[in-house]
Amino acid sequence: MIPQLFVESIDLGDGRNITIETGRLAKQADGSVVVRIGKTVILGTVVSSRKATPGIDFLPLTVDYREKFAAAGRFPGGFFKREARPSDSEVLTMRLVDRVLRPLFPSDYHAEVQVMIQLMSHDEEVMPDALAGLAASAALALSDIPFETLISEARVGRIDGKFIINPSRAQLELSDIDMMIGASTDSIAMVEGEMKEISEAEMLEAIKFAHEHIKVQIAAQERLAAAFGKKEVRTYEKEKSDDAIYAKVKEAAYDKIYNIAKVGSAKQERTAAFDAVKEEVKALFTEEELAENGDLVSKYFYKTNKEAVRNVTLDLGTRLDGRKTTEIRPIWCEVDYLPSVHGSALFTRGETQALATATLGTSREANQIDSPSQQGEEKFYLHYNFPPFSTGEARPLRGTSRREVGHGNLAQRALKNMIPADCPYTIRVVSEVLESNGSSSMATVCAGTLSLMDAGIQMIRPVSGIAMGLITDGERFAVLSDILGDEDHLGDMDFKVTGTSEGITACQMDIKIDGLKYEIMEAALAQARDGRLHILNILTETLATPKVDVKAYAPKIIMRTIPGNFIGALIGPGGKVIQELQKATGTTIVINEVDEMGVVEILGTDPAGIEAVLAKIESITFKPQIGEAYEVKVIKMLDFGAVVEYTAVPGNEVLLHVSELAWERTENVTDVVNMGDVFMVKYLGLDPKTRKEKVSRKALLPRPPREEKKE
């Protein structure tokens, strides 16, 4: 018997429909749905353990998003022909979903939760990452897992001033906005995206537009859950609590923490002072009490610490390090810090420091993207590294973390639209975070800008970035500029904004509270603009404009376009010509065929080597015109003529037959021309008999009068 299928539809308002269905697939999961639009099919499942994981005080949530190659009718690459570790784009989608879901579970729910979202069928007109949040939330809606409220996510674009929900990849190429928004019916929870220098007001309009569509998607989830039969929320073992212990900890610690926080101090000094207070609090309990309830003492101390620090800011407008809410930490920058790289810059803001390098190359170094939903390449990409010493820690290095992928992607999106479209280089920027106490990704944007300018990349405009925070108790609120790491953990919002003097280029926002008003978001954006323009002024004081040219030891790239039928001649049999040319000139030559033309990239540090390659290309592609005169030089003597080369393109040779030397009969070639002689010839085209090129010296000479025959 085929199980009953439950289906709900979402009208996107432009002729497209999303359907959510359940009842047939993955029924042993706590919740499962299939999301469809066009030919795209996404399976979303959620499972949670029945018991909390022992010894942890956080939510062990795992969000996994995978795109199956079969979905696009393709085979995975590699030796094993099997999907393996997730790609960067899959990791980014996992983060987008995780950041919206995580705050919505009960704070005392510590059972392991696994959300799995899989692309099972792909439609080239649909970008599946925009549907991942919908699939995850719909699966949770059908489960008995405790969950505060339903959410969904949507992508918004804008073409010619008109907003579009969930645009296709082709539409995004024309759009000046690419933002993902995650929200519940009442509140915005997450924003991330890139823009082409839009205003703060335009960004808010885009968020509001997406939110209205998200409300429709959430209503469809509610209808599906009602039709399917919403399960009763499971009971779970809640965290133990003790009001008496909390009161004792708060009474002993609150005032001391408040006084430490309002004075303002450096991170290490402040941490030591808080640790000392914690030890004083623990001393109020016996060893037996700590053995039984030590975890509660630590938990309540953290809760008291958070409350006291937040109240200092709301009461006094003072922050942990003594700054006012709008104040930015001291900044210093330096370019050309590393002597042998193509471009480098050091950016330090307070206790956060990033060292960025820029490396230039040919299209051969482009970052290749090969996933079921996207194929292509990136000629500009940025990598972000966050070593443990940057926070004074020692921990194992286990490869690139999801956080590093996410932060690097944000910085890349902030900068990429300021790279000129006609820039011939492939560019890799690497940010090494050397110190971190808040907004290291924004330090990466600033250091990345300076490293690109130092490398001689003619950026359209420099980009700066700032991380904003928020503290609110429901009645009062304080927007914080340039937040510390502690303010990120203790606050209600982490809002990163990057932009130029003309507008916003990228943003990332995570909101940890419900019901954040648009007025507060508007205030945060306005304060962020003041902050990033202040930082931008410091960047331009360090380096006002990009350096005129690349550095002497950095490669220069020259591009030439040749007819497609000459590509083979430039490469040569088995690559012989191009390999010998690269070896002889010390250059790198890359040839790409575009629209039946050959685009040749020549990369080298020696101008003479580049000129030699250009001369060779001119020689190979030189095509004389029939009837035109050209200057030639004799380079070889033969019994039946002379081999000459065009002086304009040395190496391009042609035979001048003895019969074309002069009008008079020529017995010996040397009677007319000799080695090294330079003269003009006329190009006659291909000889119909030999099919070889033919030139003539005599065709440019006056023809002697015919002798009359004697009777």
Swiss-Prot record:
Xref: InterPro entries: ExoRNase_PH_dom1, ExoRNase_PH_dom2, ExoRNase_PH_dom2_sf, KH_dom, KH_dom_type_1, KH_dom_type_1_sf, NA-bd_OB-fold, PNPase
A GO CC annotation given for this chain: cytosol
Residues involved in Mg(2+) binding: 488, 494
Ranges where the record places region Disordered: 691-711
Subcellular location: Cytoplasm
Domain KH intervals: 555-617
Keywords: Cytoplasm, Magnesium, Metal-binding, Nucleotidyltransferase, RNA-binding, Transferase
Pfam families assigned to the protein according to its UniProt record, in alphabetical order: KH_1, PNPase, RNase_PH, RNase_PH_C, S1
EC number(s) reported in the record: 2.7.7.8
GO BP: any one term: RNA processing
Top-level division of the source organism's lineage: Bacteria
All copies of domain S1 motif, residue ranges: 627-698
GO MF annotation list: 3'-5'-RNA exonuclease activity; magnesium ion binding; polyribonucleotide nucleotidyltransferase activity; RNA binding
Cofactor: Mg(2+)
Reaction(s) the record says it catalyses: RNA(n+1) + phosphate = RNA(n) + a ribonucleoside 5'-diphosphate
Alphabetized PANTHER family for the sequence: POLYRIBONUCLEOTIDE NUCLEOTIDYLTRANSFERASE, POLYRIBONUCLEOTIDE NUCLEOTIDYLTRANSFERASE 1, MITOCHONDRIAL
Family: Belongs to the polyribonucleotide nucleotidyltransferase family.
Function: Involved in mRNA degradation. Catalyzes the phosphorolysis of single-stranded polyribonucleotides processively in the 3'- to 5'-direction.
Protein name: Polyribonucleotide nucleotidyltransferase
Organism for this UniProt entry: Flavobacterium psychrophilum (strain ATCC 49511 / DSM 21280 / CIP 103535 / JIP02/86)
Lineage start: Bacteria, Pseudomonadati, Bacteroidota, Flavobacteriia, Flavobacteriales
Gene that encodes it: pnp
